[in-house]
Every structure is written in structure tokens, then in C-alpha cells.
């Protein structure tokens, strides 16, 4: 094989590895990808504090024994699954820890700029310790609803349009 063919294969391999691994390449288990999805769908339209607060709730749950011990486990936790018409297992509407996961809509981010920001936040959040701006919150909800479970918890902070509890 001549040098040009080898060089082309190396460049092609690098490019394929770079582009195909962009979403998952930075962590083997896809934990940052899962966290980025949650930040995107729960707080993508909020300033940095709102995005970090959502990430903190997930981390607080990961560190608590009553929840799964991974970011993906916490985010995709659901009480009930059903079989769709295509034969796939899908979460039952209203039975998920985070509403976007079982709302029946696509889980593919549509706004690429917001997605990139959420992905960068998730990557650095998982790698580095952060001051918990939620004061240990394990739950939150939007300020325009009042779920039944909120009355039994202690409110910690109000950040952007979310109210946080522990």
C-alpha cells in the first residue's frame, strides 16, 4: 500500500472517530450525554444557574442510596414501561422522574446551539466538583404547577422558573 492510501485511511479513521464519537466519546457510559439531555429538556431555555441547578438535583440523587447510582439511571428512571406498536419498550406517560423522558415526543435536541451549551455544562459538571446551588435539593418543579408531593418537602431555593426541595 502506498503512503498516500495509508495517509488517507489514517485521516478518514480520525475523522470518523472524531465525528461519530462527538456525543459519547468523552465518557464511556454516556453519563454526560444523559445529563446533557436532561439539562437541555428541563432547563435549556434558562440561564446558566437554572441549568446547573437541574444538574445538581441529578447529582444529589446519584449520591443518595434511594436512587440509581448513575446519571443515566436517575434520569431514565421510570415506574412503568409498556410495549409500543413497534415492539419497543417505552416509558408510560407521567410515570418518569423527569417529564420530558415520557412525554411521547422526540428526545432529539432540535436547537444545536443550546445542545452544545448543555453538553459542555454536563461534561465539566461530571468532571469537576461544583458548589451545590440547590442546597441539597432532590426534587424540583416548574413554578406554574403545584404537584401533590411538594407539600411534604422543604423548599430550598427558587432558581429561574423552578422551585427546589429536599
Task: State what each model feature region is.
Residues 1-2:
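N-terminal secretory signal peptides that target proteins for export/translocation
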Amino acid at each position: 500500500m502506498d503512503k498516500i492510501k495509508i495517509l488517507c485511511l489514517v485521516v478518514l479513521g480520525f475523522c470518523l472517530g472524531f465525528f461519530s464519537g462527538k456525543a459519547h466519546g468523552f465518557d464511556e457510559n454516556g453519563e454526560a450525554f444523559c445529563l446533557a439531555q436532561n439539562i437541555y429538556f428541563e432547563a435549556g431555555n434558562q440561564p446558566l444557574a437554572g441549568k446547573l441547578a437541574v444538574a445538581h438535583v441529578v447529582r444529589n440523587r446519584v449520591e443518595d442510596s434511594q436512587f440509581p447510582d448513575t446519571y443515566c439511571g436517575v434520569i431514565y428512571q421510570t415506574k412503568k414501561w409498556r410495549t409500543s406498536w413497534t415492539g419497543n419498550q417505552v416509558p408510560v406517560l407521567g410515570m418518569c422522574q423527569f417529564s420530558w423522558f415520557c412525554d411521547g415526543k422526540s428526545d432529539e435536541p432540535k436547537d444545536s446551539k443550546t445542545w452544545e451549551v448543555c453538553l459542555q455544562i454536563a461534561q465539566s459538571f461530571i468532571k469537576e466538583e461544583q458548589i451545590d446551588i440547590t442546597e441539597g435539593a432532590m426534587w424540583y418543579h416548574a413554578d406554574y404547577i403545584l404537584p401533590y408531593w411538594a407539600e411534604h418537602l422543604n423548599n430550598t431555593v427558587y432558581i429561574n422558573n423552578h422551585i427546589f426541595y429536599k
